[in-house]
Amino acid sequence: MERDEYQLPNSHGKNTFLSRIFGLQSDEVNPSLNSQEMSNFPLPDIERGSSLLHSTNDSREDVDENDLRVPESDQGTSTEEEDEVDEEQVQAYAPQISDGLNGDHQLNSVTSKENVLETEKSNLERLVEGSTDDSVPKVGQLSSEEEEDNEFINNDGFDDDTPLFQKSKIHEFSSKKSNTIEDGKRPLFFRHIYQNNRPQRDTQKLFTSSNAIHHDKDKSANNGPRNINGNQKHGTKYFGSATQPRFTGSPLNNTNRFTKLFPLRKPNLLSNISVLNNTPEDRINTLSVKERALWKWANVENLDIFLQDVYNYYLGNGFYCIILEKILNICTLLFVVFVSTYMGHCVDYSKLPTSHRVSDIIIDKCYSNSITGFTKFFLWMFYFFVILKIVQLYFDVQKLSELQNFYKYLLNISDDELQTLPWQNVIQQLMYLKDQNAMTANVVEVKAKNRIDAHDVANRIMRRENYLIALYNSDILNLSLPIPLFRTNVLTKTLEWNINLCVMGFVFNESGFIKQSILKPSQREFTREELQKRFMLAGFLNIILAPFLVTYFVLLYFFRYFNEYKTSPGSIGARQYTPIAEWKFREYNELYHIFKKRISLSTTLANKYVDQFPKEKTNLFLKFVSFICGSFVAILAFLTVFDPENFLNFEITSDRSVIFYITILGAIWSVSRNTITQEYHVFDPEETLKELYEYTHYLPKEWEGRYHKEEIKLEFCKLYNLRIVILLRELTSLMITPFVLWFSLPSSAGRIVDFFRENSEYVDGLGYVCKYAMFNMKNIDGEDTHSMDEDSLTKKIAVNGSHTLNSKRRSKFTAEDHSDKDLANNKMLQSYVYFMDDYSNSENLTGKYQLPAKKGYPNNEGDSFLNNKYSWRKQFQPGQKPELFRIGKHALGPGHNISPAIYSTRNPGKNWDNNNNGDDIKNGTNNATAKNDDNNGNNDHEYVLTESFLDSGAFPNHDVIDHNKMLNSNYNGNGILNKGGVLGLVKEYYKKSDVGR
């Protein structure tokens, strides 16, 4: 019988079931199976019905290795339905396989092949007709339980760091049901066959059009519109895995509001794309641009990397913006290196005083004569690095071109729209594209693509970032040094980059999944030692690179910020958030553009909170410094008037002329004067911090009731520090980071390994992700958040937290318990609420640079975030009460109420000074009068408060001062007449005057 007799068209020789049993044409049967061959399981084809027959292969070498694709994320354990089908298949084939193998051991006999093929055909027809299971066989990164059960099949020489998704999944059939065949009763070879070989079904076509049978059947079974999470409008399930209940009752159900605000055409794929099914990879250049983009989409091998590229393209505002940014970054690097090299080796500074032209001080052939040895070697190294960057740019252009075609032809989004288009619309277009063409060439990707929704997309894009958020919030990293000034944990960008390289590069493999060795408790000591070695190696490399990095960044910061500080000296007091603050403020699954906008909006409130606290000691010192510097500048400027040509070049000290000192002292004077606080601010730090919390999402329980304390302000300033201090720390970090990597971080290696193992949660279709990013916590009062709708969960957060939710479902959530577990759980719940608000609130459907049109954001540049606009004219104009100009509503609450005896609306005239009558008007003074607003028909009165208010009963504890005596020059401020006359006044003036200011 010919082997091709049973081969179906479009199968491409992918059927490997029969070849694994009968295709071993050698006399010696090898009981070990090719593990990589197990990763290629085609989909069941429902539309082909009972015509599912499979071709056999002469040997395992006949399988095209190029067509075998690494499973990206279908890393789950089998569901119950798949287990039932697998067991039926094993039981159906067991007699035939046993007869064929235990008889004459003729594995290559034609009769045995025909019998088993006929039995396989009948059983497959029965399974297809009686089963509607279209799930994909689970291939990929195994869960930890499956790893322990299947360790017997792994080769001893297999690399421990090989990711789980690259290993073949050995399906277990032990003790799941009573009728399962016991593997222990069979030889190892039979167990291999029973556990690994299933009847292979006809492979799905590479592409399916929008009107394909499978798609129509799926649409009929799941009839109804879909929302942004890829779920139906009724009976919606939002988050979770395929085997877990998801959040229900969410306002994400609103389907049409996205297309109403930003109308986009749904992806319209080609009507006839059957030609693409047989197009190999080496001939995709013959396809049109749209067909090639569709071919790339169908051949996605790693959905994590693909979605990260899609998001980075959106974040970079399209093809031309990204390319321009990369080119300008290379130009910046070239400029810094060449300018610094030229100024250091090609200029003869000794000729500057006597020369009048640039050509007089330039050294000829400086690159060949002046630059030698060590410097020239590193210049050549720099040239080589620039060449690598240019080559990388070439490949980036090709990759970005493919992404541009994907956006343009498949998502119907142009580059011009990316700057104003919300990310939610991009997800919506991805879901439409998935609905039209969910099938791919890589069959194990089908289930992953069927899980495309807002939550899963965020988990894939931020798989690493979610772990980093939890890592930095857990405070398990030791970043201090046992030397003065460095005993506290200070995170800098340099140290953050090294941690990301050492930790994340060690925990995750090249495909973006956690390595097997990290998840196994038995390999904890091995991974801990390897991570320690990695830290120490990174520290050694940083020591070697430190001199060059310090030189480069000093020049870069000098060129970037010198002119800013020169033209705007007040900007030296500008503040920004530290790197550790950004990680503490960021929520799980919060994409970078959302976080960046939120943090940028918080700076106004953060400055207001810091500026509320007086800085009298600093002001006094700066006033003295500005006075001294200003005095010297004035003297030098005055002397310059008499002889401007000669005096400007007059040397006050060795090689330091008058111009030098005028420049230096003038800069110091300008900085000190602009740093002095001269404005008046309303002091209400509690209300300001609560408003600031709406943007930072950070308000520790320890701060409660102490918002007005100086120590709380200092603690906040550690997170919101001066920019000049942060820059100095970055430069210092270039020299300190090697020692932190060598001495401090290795002690945290064990806790880091435990952190990843304990905080990793397996999700079917996603793989291992940070458990807090799944928003699934069952240990809060024994309730499962997946079974709660958003309103119920929001109310629960409001009860547990110390703050209340506002109308936009924003929770002000702080922990009641100070344990690390409760703090982590509280942050997870908080992240869930804000995630729902970002994706379900139509007001947040804005681009990366736009503000939502809602209350709380300034409409104009002059508008303030707070209701505390301070104006002396407004606050103290006649008829106003200064007490009403507090930020909070509690200004006139308990403890702040104005005495009824003072502000009596019934008869206000009784409370004023009875000594002042109408005659005072003649004397040039005005009484406080009360005007009753009869038109309003209420008891509200408008008071006109003038100078006589000081003489009234508004201050009952003070002695009543005769107003006429105040006009007398012999009257002092204490109610006592000066006995000394004019001399007494002069003495009193010098006693209380502010001469030093």
UniProtKB/Swiss-Prot annotation:
It catalyses: a 1,2-diacyl-sn-glycero-3-phosphocholine(in) = a 1,2-diacyl-sn-glycero-3-phosphocholine(out); a 1,2-diacyl-sn-glycero-3-phospho-L-serine(in) = a 1,2-diacyl-sn-glycero-3-phospho-L-serine(out); a 1,2-diacyl-sn-glycero-3-phosphoethanolamine(in) = a 1,2-diacyl-sn-glycero-3-phosphoethanolamine(out); a 1,2-diacyl-sn-glycero-3-phospho-(1D-myo-inositol-3-phosphate)(in) = a 1,2-diacyl-sn-glycero-3-phospho-(1D-myo-inositol-3-phosphate)(out). GO terms for cellular component: autophagosome; cytoplasmic vesicle membrane; endoplasmic reticulum membrane; Golgi membrane; mitochondrial membrane; phagophore assembly site membrane. Its main location: membrane. It is found in: Preautophagosomal structure membrane; Cytoplasmic vesicle membrane; Golgi apparatus membrane; Endoplasmic reticulum membrane. Forms a homotrimer with a solvated central pore, which is connected laterally to the cytosol through the cavity within each protomer. Acts as a lipid scramblase that uses its central pore to function: the central pore opens laterally to accommodate lipid headgroups, thereby enabling lipid flipping and redistribution of lipids added to the outer leaflet of ATG9-containing vesicles, thereby enabling growth into autophagosomes. Belongs to the ATG9 family. This is Autophagy-related protein 9.
